[in-house]
């Protein structure tokens, strides 16, 4: 009796990840070469790059920063502990939210929150350093966790692994380029300015992101 109740395949509920395409619209199965020729790839990779400075510019020296801003060494260690908690929470919670409201709105929320926290972090003192840093690690890890689903939504499933790898190159570029720029600019002020600029750039890139249009079928002669 149970088998009589099953349908093959089971009906699929509409999801935000379908990018607003109608049910009759063909799915996208872009190869890495095709993906690299799209505007959407460069916007996504740019957003990934811009997500890095808010955390990676500060994580190597977060203990020192906490002590410089009024914490003793034992208290400053909580920035590492709560930063890890924030990272884990971001990876678990925000992909769930993106399943409900869509990847693009989720990423825009995360970049907006990261922007606000980066501005507050510039002036944070004492335990506020710990709290704000935990919030920044939440946003950073959440953006990374949503990226594979965003990649699949935009470019299709068959080449999802390689396509995601190309998108993740943005993180590698950001982790190298932003510290270099901060060192050239001056570590203390430059790090905060670059973190704010990165959040603005990431928000703008995701705001400009639109679904990849499927190739048009050739017109019959």
How would you name each of these model-derived features?
Residues 91-102, 186:
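Helix-to-loop junctions at the C-terminal end of transmembrane segments
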Residues 142-155:
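Intracellular juxtamembrane helix-capping segments at the cytosolic ends
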Residues 100-111:
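Cytoplasmic membrane-interface "Motif A"-like loop-to-helix N-cap segments
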Residues 182-198:
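A membrane-interface helix-boundary motif in multi-pass transporters
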Residues 1-22, 204-211:
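C-terminal membrane-cytosol helix-exit motif in multi-pass small-molecule transporters
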Residues 33-96:
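Extracytoplasmic gate region of multi-pass secondary transporters
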Residues 113-125:
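C-terminal ends and interior cores of transmembrane alpha-helices
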